[in-house]
Amino acid sequence: MFKLKVFTDGGSKGNPGPASIGGVFYIDNKKIFQFNQSIGIATNNDAEYQALIYALEEIKKQKEKLANDFKVEKIEFYSDSRLLVNQVKGFFKVKNGKIKEYILKIHSLEQEINLPISYHQIPREKNKEADRLVNI
């Protein structure tokens, strides 16, 4: 049984301003995939959520390969955004309508992926690779 560890990050210059997302996927401490993408004008929070959604959509696309080739049975997400992690886990109330839409999309993707998924907040220093991809 292998865990897929996914580190995501998002940021904007200006908040709102030009924004980017990034993420890195690891299995057994080996990098298997990474992404970075400009997302136009957005807030930092929007970028954090869009990074997570992008990662979930990529996992959904690669679900068969992850299950068959890599024997992934569990997914762990890591983010330095305390707000994102606690809102996705249901610990913090979501007031913003756009964030509510992101949460619904995340939960829908979780159901489609149909594997155990957990979310963890980490210090910014432990998210350097995803942060680097945001700032390319």
Predicted regions and their residues:
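Alpha-helix C-terminal capping segments
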Residues: 1, 133-136
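RNase H-like nuclease fold core
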Residues: 1-46, 57-58
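Short, conserved alpha-helix that lines the donor NDP-sugar binding/gating region
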Residues: 48, 52
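RNase H catalytic domain
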Residues: 11, 15, 53-134
